[in-house]
């Protein structure tokens, strides 16, 4: 059975590479998040593989609340018999390409690199690659079943479109609507580690309000920018203490704090009356998000209080919970670990990552979940969220084989 699955992946790998290239060629930047056209293209491609696709358009009000334009989640189900339901989740939305590319971001060019053929394009590693990984893993199981292999259970593909803005209208929406109730889940990842935990993330928008005045008479105003510089200095000073809080999870170090956006002011010759900035606070799995947010709000208020006449308003933009292992995750991890060792020739460890992902939405429902898919050892190797994002095609083939064999184990 192992041979038949591996043989199917090998024999159909040109089709799989072409399938991935066609997905990469259709932009799905988020922001702005107009992702329904990509879902339509993915539907046609999946149907071309003989798979039945359920499109689930997300209502426009929910899409707008997520800061997007359109989103259609796709579900593919194949029932082999009575048994567990295993969901495979990957996201098709991508961050905008930005500058500095040597290759066309939506060209899906393949280059013969020293380590073998490599495909370039936005989303090729995060995570349109796992649309291909999971679809062809399912096809490999279907082919094995036609040859007489008995499987018990159901495989579902959850192909969603809002991971880059939080996942609330992707996996979370599918689960809340009762469209799916899986027993296990595997979410998009890379090939050389099985991720079982990740950081949480809190985004806060802070508005600092003062009073405008003529720049020739600054004392008649209340300078919001001067206050903001002090507040930012206080935040940056707290980084040293955060660096001392070390997680016990392998692959995760300490909490971090970053200010990524700032805007404000009226004109060069006016005392600024309003500054808005957004901060990103990454939380290790051991932290309690509600406590982290409360402490930040107290810290911001105390820093602002040093500036008479300044008002501060704090709004939560995003709260992504940390991923902690759910009971039963080890069953998935062990099913992946053995074929990974056989295919890759190395032991694939379980680890944590400092990112946050859609996997947390499954864990929040008590569903055992790990991250595993096609990709290199690190995000840096893939240039994820960077120019010339890339994927070694050998990693795509390996991951497809490994996931298919893991599914065969879980459904046996």
Predicted regions and their residues:
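Hydrophobic/aromatic beta-strand patches that form the interior of the parallel beta-sheet core
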Residues: 54, 86-88, 158, 184-186, ...
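Acidic/histidine-rich catalytic neighborhood of metal-dependent amide-processing enzymes
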Residues: 118, 123-201, 411-412
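Metal-dependent amide/peptide-bond hydrolase catalytic core
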Residues: 1-4, 65, 190, 195-197, ...
């Amino acid at each position: 059975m192992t041979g038949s699955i591996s043989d199917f992946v090998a024999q159909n790998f040109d089709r799989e590479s072409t399938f991935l290239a066609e997905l990469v060629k259709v932009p799905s930047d988020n922001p702005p998040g107009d992702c329904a056209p990509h879902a339509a293209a993915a539907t046609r491609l999946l149907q071309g593989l003989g798979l039945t696709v359920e499109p689930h358009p997300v209502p426009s009000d929910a899409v707008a609340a997520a800061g997007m334009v359109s989103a259609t989640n796709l579900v593919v189900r194949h029932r082999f018999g009575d048994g567990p339901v295993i969901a495979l989740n990957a996201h098709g939305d991508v961050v905008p390409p930005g500058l500095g590319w040597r290759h066309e971001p939506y060209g899906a060019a393949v280059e013969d690199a020293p380590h073998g053929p490599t495909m370039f394009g936005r989303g090729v590693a995060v995570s349109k690659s796992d649309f291909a990984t999971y679809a062809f893993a399912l096809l490999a199981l279907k082919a094995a079943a036609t040859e007489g292999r008995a499987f018990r259970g159901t495989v579902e593909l959850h192909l969603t479109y809002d991971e880059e803005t939080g996942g609330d209208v992707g996996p979370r929406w599918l689960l809340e609507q009762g469209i799916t109730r899986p027993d296990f889940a595997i979410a998009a990842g890379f090939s050389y580690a099985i991720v079982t935990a990740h950081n949480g993330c809190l985004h806060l928008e802070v508005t600092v309000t003062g009073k405008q005045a003529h720049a020739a008479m600054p004392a008649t105003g209340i300078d919001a920018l001067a206050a903001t510089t002090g507040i930012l200095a206080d935040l940056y000073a707290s980084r040293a203490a955060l660096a001392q809080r070390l997680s016990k999870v392998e692959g995760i170090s300490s909490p971090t704090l970053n200010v990524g956006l700032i805007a404000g002011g009226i004109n060069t010759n006016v005392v600024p009356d309003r500054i808005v900035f957004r901060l990103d606070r990454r939380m290790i799995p051991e932290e309690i998000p509600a406590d982290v947010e409360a402490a930040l709000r107290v810290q911001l208020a105390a820093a602002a209080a040093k500036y008479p006449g300044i008002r501060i308003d704090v709004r939560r933009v995003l709260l992504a919970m940390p991923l902690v292992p759910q009971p039963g995750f080890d069953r998935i991890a062990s099913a992946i670990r053995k074929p990974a060792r056989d295919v890759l020739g190395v032991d694939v460890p379980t680890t944590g990552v400092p990112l946050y992902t859609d996997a947390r939405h499954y864990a929040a429902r008590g569903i055992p979940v790990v991250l595993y898919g096609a990709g290199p050892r690190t995000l840096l190797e893939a240039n994820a969220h960077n120019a010339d994002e890339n994927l070694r095609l050998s990693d795509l083939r390996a991951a497809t084989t490994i996931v298919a064999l893991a599914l065969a184990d879980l459904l046996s």
